Structures are given as C-alpha cells and as structure tokens.
C-alpha cells in the first residue's frame, strides 16, 4: 500500500514538473516573439493558463499585458498588470521587469483616463531607469510622459520628454521610434508657436523617414509641413516639396482632404480649397 502511494506521488511530481517545464518553454517562446511578432506571442499566451509558481504567474501577467498593448488592444482594467506588480514589487533585483510592469500599468491608467495616476507611475519608472542601461525602454517611457504633458497642453515639458525619447531611441539605434519622437518634438514646438524650429524638426523627420523608407511617417511629415507653411504664411514653400505633398495625399480619407485644403491654399486656389474643406466636414471617409 505504501509503495502504491509513493508511486502515485512520484507520478504527480513527474507530470507537474513536465507541465511546469512546458509552461516555462511557452512563456520563453512568447517573450522571444513579442517585439517583432506580437500577434503570435498573444496567440501563444491565450493558449496558456495563469498557473504555476508565483514567478511564472507574474511573468505570464506581464507578458500578456505587453502583448495586448503591442497588438493595440486597449485594456482599461488593471487587474492583470496589478497581479504582476504584486510579485515584482518584492523583487528589486529584477529591475527590468519592475520597470516594464509599472510602465504598462501606467498605460492602462492612461487609457482609463487617470492621467495623474499614469504620470506618477511613469515618474517612478524614470527614477528606477537611472540605474539601468536600457535606452529603448527609456525612450518608450519618455514618449509616454511626453504624451501626458502634451495632452495637458504643457508643451515645454512635453518637448523636453519627447527630446529625451528621441535621444534614447537614437542611442538604441531604433530609427523608426527616433522618427516618431522627432515628429512629436515638432508638434510640441508648433503648439509653442516656434514655427521656424517646428519646420526644422518636421524636415528632419521627413529626412529620416525618407532615408529608411518609413512611408507612413514620411506622409505624416509632409502633411504637417503643409499645415505649417499655411499657418506661418512667411515662407514660400519649395515647388518640389509642394508637389510631393500633393501627390502623397489620398483623396478618400479625412487626413487626405485636410492636406489638399492646405495644398490648394498654398497654391492660392481658393475654390479648390473650399471644395476639399466641404469634403472634410461632410465626408464619412475613414482616416488614414
């Protein structure tokens, strides 16, 4: 009888160990995919359960939160990421996961409309990141802090953090994020009424986007340059640039109509500008 009980216990331990190894292996696989193939990472995580040790459950919760964010699924319930924090807050040596947990918790709070709560978490991460060499994650953090200040119309603080984001992305050699941060800097500068500086920054973003063939970011740069030339009214827009802006504007989207309003104003075609302005306000067309 005793032998049977012992054998049963050994079998349970064996199969539990196999399950745990399988769970860890799948979590490793999801983590490896999460940057470049977040949809695949999310599929793996959806097939797993939040089981195992406290460390495995916390890792699962953090990875799942990250995968949702990277797949543009806008979660507003923080119960999952709180579960990760309940574990990682007691493990200061795992600073990287501590920072990531607070970062994604901040994003959930921001989506739920709790901007002060999000900012408190972001500033806590900023303090912790001083002890690490993680320029990419620092860049993501500074971009989010900049967004909070931008939404509060504190454009000088927003510009400061967008610039920090750009510098960190540059250090991380991530040119796509560097281009986005440069566009954010330009937007903050534009809203601070420094048109000359905004023009330089939008032009710099366009150069980066052209160099690395980031078509959507190039289009965003062109659209904003058109608006900037219209608003400033000081400089004559180069003909080649104006032609390129016009060619980049789709004629079936709201952003495209907005760009074509600016293009026709710059060409002094008032009737055409009015035509696209009417389309802009009456069309059900989607955004770009």
Residue ranges of predicted features:
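Alpha-helical repeat scaffolds
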Residues: 44-45, 76-84, 235-245, 273-279
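Amphipathic alpha-helical segments of tetratricopeptide repeats
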Residues: 46-50, 84-90, 124-128, 163-168, ...
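N-terminal leader/linker segments that initiate helical-solenoid repeat arrays
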Residues: 18-66, 70, 74-78, 96-97
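Conserved small/polar residues in nucleotide/adenosyl-binding loops
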Residues: 281-288
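Conserved alpha-helical positions within TPR/SEL1-like repeat arrays
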Residues: 62, 69, 100-111, 136-151, ...
């Amino acid at each position: 009888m005793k032998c049977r009980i012992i054998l049963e216990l050994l079998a349970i331990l064996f199969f539990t160990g196999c399950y745990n190894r399988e769970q860890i292996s799948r979590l490793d696989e999801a983590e490896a995919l999460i940057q470049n193939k977040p949809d695949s990472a999310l599929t793996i995580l959806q097939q797993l359960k939040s089981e195992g040790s406290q460390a495995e459950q916390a890792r699962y919760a953090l990875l799942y939160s990250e995968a949702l964010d990277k797949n543009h699924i806008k979660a507003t319930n923080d119960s999952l990421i709180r579960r990760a924090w309940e574990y990682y807050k007691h493990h200061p040596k795992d600073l990287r996961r501590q920072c990531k947990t607070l970062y994604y918790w901040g994003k959930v709070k921001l989506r739920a409309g709790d901007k002060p709560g999000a900012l408190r978490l972001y500033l806590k991460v900023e303090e912790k990141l001083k002890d690490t060499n993680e320029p990419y994650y620092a860049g993501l953090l500074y971009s989010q802090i900049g967004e909070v200040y931008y939404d509060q119309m504190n454009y000088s603080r927003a510009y400061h953090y967008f610039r920090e984001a750009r510098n960190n992305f540059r250090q991380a050699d991530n040119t796509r994020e560097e281009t986005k941060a440069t566009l954010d800097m330009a937007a903050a500068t534009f809203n601070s009424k420094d048109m000359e500086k905004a023009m330089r920054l939008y032009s710099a973003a366009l150069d980066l986007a052209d160099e690395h063939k980031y078509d959507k970011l190039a289009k965003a740069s062109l659209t904003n340059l058109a608006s900037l030339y219209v608003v400033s009214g000081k400089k004559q827009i180069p003909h080649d640039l104006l032609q390129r802006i016009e060619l980049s504007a789709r004629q079936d989207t709201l952003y495209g109509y907005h760009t074509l309003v600016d293009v026709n104003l710059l060409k002094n075609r008032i009737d055409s500008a009015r035509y696209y302005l009417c389309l802009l306000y009456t069309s059900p067309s989607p955004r770009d």
